[in-house]
Amino acid sequence: MRDMAQIRNIVVLSGAGISAESGLRTFRADDGLWEDHRVEDVATPEAFRRDPDLVQRFYDERRASIMAAQPNAAHRALARLDREWPAELLIVTQNIDDLHERAGAARVLHMHGEGLSAWCSACDARHHWTGTLRDEPPCPACGARALRPDIVWFGEMPYRMDEIFAALARADLFVSIGTSGAVYPAAGFVQQAKSCGARTLELNLERSQGSHGFDETRLGPASERVPEWVEDALGGRPC
């Protein structure tokens, strides 16, 4: 990979692997939630219409898990990069937790929604939410009992794609951390960035399905590989 001195704009994509080390289980990992619930039962609009109580209970549990988790060394390293990187940096996360923000990162975009947010299908308002949704509480904005988890379910369009593609077009470096490379559109970001001239780096516990598309892959736990890379990016100063 070329000298980081030539890199200005960076897009980081973070996936399940970065939060797994904080104890948050995912659909895609071997110990993931899919072992307990089929995706079709808890993560689709059809599932919510069919059994809203099950879906609300499922995300109430996810919300509690998020609040109990703590950022790890990878989150803290990216927060440091966010503070100290002098040019454009965008952290695009597939995760619904707030561990990037709690570690101190500000330039974060949640393409799949946020576990600590509720969306009202009646008035389109979004609210920070730490309690339960199972008992159908009223929307604080309009009073309708139409709140659901502010999550992008399978079959729905990810959030803020225009902003993501614009950032990828400007990127000099695209870094993917802890992703499976199996879920689109995020799995296509590496090719999108490369087509616009960016260099590409994968940091992952094991090679993803899209590893062949990266200029470089560094394998190992995110809590080790990410601080190492951030140290390199910031000129060798230890995290």
Map each language-model feature to its residues:
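Conserved catalytic core of sirtuin-type NAD+-dependent deacylases
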Residues: 1-239
